[in-house]
Amino acid sequence: MKVKGSLKSHRNRDKNCKVVKRGGRIYIINEIKPRCKTRQGS
């Protein structure tokens, strides 16, 4: 999983990317391409 300061560019990488909030963190998940997984923050 990648950790980024901003998810704006990662959100638009693939049409199957979804933005999800879990436990106060923001994640981008993609069930078709798991390598697109990203988390915001340190």
From Swiss-Prot:
Identify the species of origin. Answer: Wolbachia sp. subsp. Brugia malayi (strain TRS)
Please provide one cellular component term from the Gene Ontology annotations of this protein: ribonucleoprotein complex
Name by which UniProt lists this protein: Large ribosomal subunit protein bL36
Query: A Pfam family matched by this chain, by name?
Result: Ribosomal_L36
| Gene Ontology biological-process entries | translation
Supply the source organism's classification: Bacteria, Pseudomonadati, Pseudomonadota, Alphaproteobacteria, Rickettsiales
Q: Name the residues that span the membrane.
A: none
Family classification: Belongs to the bacterial ribosomal protein bL36 family.
> Keyword annotations for this protein?
Ribonucleoprotein, Ribosomal protein
